[in-house]
Each structure stands twice: as structure tokens, then as C-alpha cells.
Amino acid sequence: MGHSATDLNETRILLYYCFTPIDDPTAVMLWQRALCEQLELKGRILISKHGINGTVGGSLASCKQYVRRTREFPGFKKMEFKWSAGSADDFPRLSVKVREEIVAFGAPDELKVDENGVIGGGVHLKPEEVNKLVEERGDEVVFFDGRNAMEAEIGKFKNAIVPDVRTTHDFISEIESGKYDDLKDKPVVTYCTGGIRCEILSSLMKNRGFEEVYQIDGGIVRYGEKYGDKGLWEGSLYVFDGRMHMEFSDDAATLGRCRACGHATNDFHNCVNEQCREQILLCEECAADPESATCGRKECAEVAAEMVG
């Protein structure tokens, strides 16, 4: 089948996941790697016995073919793909790996999946159902950020609780800490970029006594596509590729503040210390000055001072 000039010239990024039992993750990994290489796609794909989690970029024609051929695998037949602007150039390389978990919560044996997805997860809400829940229950509804705390610095749901986590691995100890026990009888709406982290987080929360847990179908991406900046979402969305962040309209608020001077910015930069490289919010001016372009740790400040000296 031929491709139109548009399909060959235009590029896209695909974001997708599917929880389904996979008997032979290594075989699926080899198939996916060969498929992406053939279609000249770049990105990152993780496969485990629980399913697949991926983001890839390339020509529109290749992305369309990738979707069609990936859905030929029985467990992936109904998998949803989210399309966004971008290309293979937004990724350094193609990485396809088998892992114990497709999201590293540190609970591979607690997670249970069947052909319908995660067993015992939170109730799925479509974007309009999220707004309806808030209309009906008001301030009783709590938005619970299922991402790393850093991501929420540039965008989050209005009045959301942002747990103190640096990585997904920190979530279990955080929700077991007792800090959020007062939420156990409230409607809690978990949210994350595309929905995958909340599939797992919502089930972990329910297993720990949170009674009324929800998750947003398609995550922030789906909600933002529907409501832009006229709904309950505020600011920019952090993304894990060369774009670093995306906005749903030209009216997006700039929530982030430069770590050094406090000016409004949504741009993350790596700490100037090559051994650290922690991502920090910096305006362009402070990012260009080694003395201000550090995460604040003593050893990083010393490296910066040497660079200036």
C-alpha cells in the first residue's frame, strides 16, 4: 500500500501502554525491536510479564504502520495510542528492553493483570466525568499527583496534592507514611501523564485502605486535549523526550519558577555538574551562568565555582 506525501513528510510521537499477561516478554521485545528498526522509529519501549509501555517517534507513515502491526499481537488488539507532535529526533536512540515492571513501583508481585488490564485498580473516569465528579462533590474531591514531584513544578490539577517523591519507587513508602490517611474515605482522583502510572498507583492505594479511588482515562494528555486550559488543569505538561514540556493552548499559565532567581519559567536544565545532571527549573539567563546553574548541593556548587574560576 502506498503512502501519501503528507504521511512521509510529516512526523509524530506515539505514547501508549497496555496491561495484559505476556508469557514470553523476550520474544515480544525482539519482535518490537525488529519492527521499530524496520520502520526507523526511535524511542523507549519497556516490556514485562504485565504488559508494554512505550513512546516512539518517526514519520507519520511509519507510526501508522507501527500501530497497525503492533495491534496484530492478540493482547495488544485494543491498545490505545496517543498521538502528539514530534519526531524520531526527539529521542537519542531506540531502546527496547525487558524489565520486571513496566513502571518501577517496586511491587512486581503485588500487581495483578488479566486480559482486561490491571485487576483492582481505581475507577476510570473520562475527562468530562472528572469535571462532573467535581461539580457534584466539590471540595470533597482530592486530586492526587501520580508523577515525580518535579513534574508538578510546571503543571498540575487545581489544588492537587503533590506527594514528596523523587521517583516512582518512592510512592509505596509515601502512601504508607500516614500523611494521607485522612484521604482514605474521600474521593481521590489520581492522575499522571498518559494514565499508566495511575493504573498501578490506584491499585496500590486501594490495597492500602483508600476506599474511593479514581484514575483519568488517558491521563493528563486526554484531559488537556479535551479542555485545553479552560478546565481544571493548570500550566504545562512535563514530557520525557526532547520537547521537555508541552502546552494544551497558547493560554497556558507559567507555573514554574527559576530555582536561582525566581522568574517564571517552564524550562528544565541539567545541573552543571556532569556527575549530577539533576533536572532543575532555570530561566535562560541563570542557565547560562555556571554559578546559578546548579541543583544547590555543596559538591555541585564547588564544581560550578571551579568552572567560573
From Swiss-Prot:
Do you know which CDD domains this protein is assigned to? RHOD_YceA
Q: Which domain of life is it from?
A: Bacteria
Which residues are annotated as active site? Answer: 192
- What reaction is this protein's catalytic activity? uridine(34) in tRNA + AH2 + O2 = 5-hydroxyuridine(34) in tRNA + A + H2O
- Identify the enzyme class: oxidoreductase
Q: Which NCBIfam families match?
A: PRK00142.1-2, PRK00142.1-3
Q: What does this protein do?
A: Catalyzes oxygen-dependent 5-hydroxyuridine (ho5U) modification at position 34 in tRNAs.
Q: Name it.
A: tRNA uridine(34) hydroxylase
- The organism's taxonomic lineage, starting at the top: Bacteria, Bacillati, Actinomycetota, Actinomycetes, Mycobacteriales
